[in-house]
Design a protein with these regions (language model features):
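Short, flexible helix-coil linker/hinge segments at the edges of structured domains or between repeats
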Residues: 56-70, 148-191, 217-234, 274-281
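Exposed, low-structure sequence patches enriched in small/polar residues
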Residues: 191-221, 235-332
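Membrane-embedded beta-strand positions of outer-membrane beta-barrel proteins
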Residues: 2-4, 42-44, 101-105, 131, ...
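Outer-membrane beta-barrel translocator domains and adjoining extracellular loop/strand segments
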Residues: 12-19, 53-59, 112-120, 156-162, ...
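Extracellular loop and loop/strand-boundary signature of outer-membrane beta-barrel proteins
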Residues: 13-17, 71-76, 113-119, 182-187, ...
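Membrane-proximal, glycine/serine-rich, low-complexity loop/turn segments characteristic
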Residues: 1-100, 126-127, 132-143, 148-150
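Short sequence motifs at beta-strands and strand-loop junctions characteristic
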Residues: 19-23, 74-83, 121-125, 187-193, ...
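Transmembrane beta-strands of outer-membrane beta-barrel pores
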Residues: 4-10, 46-50, 94, 105-111, ...
């Protein structure tokens, strides 16, 4: 299947970095099938985003991805971003009547450019690999285990086209903390790695129930480059998640769907005390002290219910309701 969409937005109810208006073009395609006894699925997504009149971001493409250490200026500017996303899934047949394996992969490459001094060109990529195994215990019970590894990197160059005027910008540390500086050029590198895993249980009888519990931990460094590396900060991002899904047919052969989700995320922002030291002709920034200076906690819980009146392999009516709880706590 393939899908082509055009979207636009406009209005004042927004965050400053989102822009007063914007538009994006999205192309999405996916397909799957069976190769011998193996199941395979894949998708490709391309989007081109134009963000107009954005403020307080002069560095990273996505300022809301959980990285508080980036640069900002007060020059309102447009951003042009492009994103390429690839997904794939492969599952094996069942071996020895109780064991099967799967592999989930994701790759994203993004390019972003700020259109006004300080002008920024940023390249972002992430790759995620998630192998898993499923153990069947009898006809009705299945147990799953998966492992996750992810790598994240973003490289960017900030540069003023008008080299005769030094641009003022700010090194952000989160929650409004910032250090004012100026210049006509700066390089930044963000490099992170993530590991995690999950446990699953499925009961398939008269009703079908799936329980999924997961945890992941990501550590990402923000560093100035390339000639004299210096830490801007480090984040330690921990994420706990849980999901319970139930598929329950009733006596009239209609269906009840219940889904509960829980997620708790904590980000520790680490800052450094550094000093430039020289040894003969060479020099480097030496770290004397580091500590957690900021914390960001987010907790979400949701409950959704749907009642489906079936009609053969389709449905004639679907009724649903849901509730969501969201709490955010940030400290510096």
């Amino acid at each position: 299947s393939a899908d082509l969409e055009y979207r636009f937005y406009d209005g004042n109810f927004r965050r400053p970095q989102q822009g007063e208006s914007g538009n994006n073009v999205v192309f999405d395609t996916e397909g799957g099938g069976k190769v011998k006894d193996f199941f395979a699925w894949g998708s490709f997504n391309y989007s081109r985003d134009k963000v107009k009149e954005a403020n307080f971001n002069s560095s990273i493409i996505d300022p809301y991805r959980g990285m508080p250490y980036y640069t900002a200026d007060t020059n309102v500017s447009n951003w042009n971003n492009q994103h390429y996303r690839l997904k794939m899934r492969v599952a094996t047949p069942q071996f020895w009547n109780f064991l099967s394996f799967g592999l989930d992969g994701y790759y994203q490459n993004s390019v972003g450019a700020k259109q006004r001094d300080m002008r920024t060109k940023s390249v972002f990529y992430t790759i995620i690999v998630r192998p898993g195994v499923v153990l069947s215990a009898g006809k009705n019970h299945r147990f799953g285990l998966d492992f996750e590894y992810a790598s994240v990197r973003e490289d960017l160059e900030m540069k003023a086209v008008n080299s005769y005027v030094e641009q003022t910008y700010y090194l952000l540390s989160g929650l409004g903390m910032a250090t004012e500086t100026s210049g006509i050029q700066r390089f930044l590198t963000y490099n992170g790695n993530q590991v995690g895993g999950g446990l699953q249980y499925n009961y398939a009888g008269r009703m079908n129930i799936l329980l999924d519990l997961g945890y992941s931990k990501k550590v990402e460094d923000a560093i100035t480059t390339p000639t004299s590396p210096r830490y801007l900060g480090t984040t330690k991002d921990g994420l706990w998640s849980g999901k319970l899904m139930a598929y329950i047919p009733d006596a009239k052969k209609n269906t009840h769907f219940v889904e509960m989700n829980w997620q708790e995320r904590k980000i520790d922002g680490i800052e450094y005390l550094q000093k430039w030291e020289t040894d003969g002709e060479e020099g480097e920034y030496k770290v004397y002290y580091k500590s957690i200076r900021s914390t960001y906690k987010t907790q979400t819980m949701s409950l959704d219910y749907r009642y489906v009146i079936n009609r053969g392999m389709e449905y004639s009516w679907k009724l649903g309701a849901g509730v969501k709880y969201w709490k955010q706590e940030e400290r510096y």
